[in-house]
Amino acid sequence: MVPKLFTSQICLLLLLGLSGVGGSLHAKPRQFTRAQWFAIQHVSLNPPQCTTAMRVINNYQRRCKDQNTFLRTTFANVVNVCGNPNITCPRNRTLHNCHRSRFQVPLLHCNLTNPGAQNISNCKYADRTERRFYVVACDNRDPRDSPRYPVVPVHLDTTI
């Protein structure tokens, strides 16, 4: 019985890892905490146009990311959303650490227009701006994160 249970647990962990529950197949670069990577990918008061803004993300991941959303607000404002009531994450219903913003913020959506680009310096994006609410997943900070915020955003789940 024990070997079967142990094998089942390993299979479950592998399945969770591949399905993205434990993280994305396009994981964050190792030098960043989840909160730091969230900030790089999703928080910018005045992001440049998408093609320029996405270069930083694509250089770290060594690929053209299909799409990305920048919240035009401060990291501190997103941290404050982590204090809103917990909700089930709309895009991953197994997670219950999401929080919805109380206010709409300006967003910049970036969509890759040339998915066949062989070189990351050739990634091109279409820009779309709008104002929306957003939902973020939050976790306790990593020891490498600033002690200023005990709970930090780690994932942009959706915009509403």
Curated annotation (Swiss-Prot):
Its EC number is 3.1.27.-. The modification 3'-nitrotyrosine is found at residue 60. The active site is at 42 (proton acceptor), 155 (proton donor). This is Eosinophil cationic protein. The keyword Transcription regulation does not apply. It is found in: Secreted. One of its GO terms (cellular component) is extracellular space. Substrate binds at residues 65-69. Residues 28-72 are annotated as: Required for nearly all of the bactericidal activities. Keywords: Disulfide bond, Endonuclease, Glycoprotein, Hydrolase, Nitration, Nuclease, Secreted, Signal.
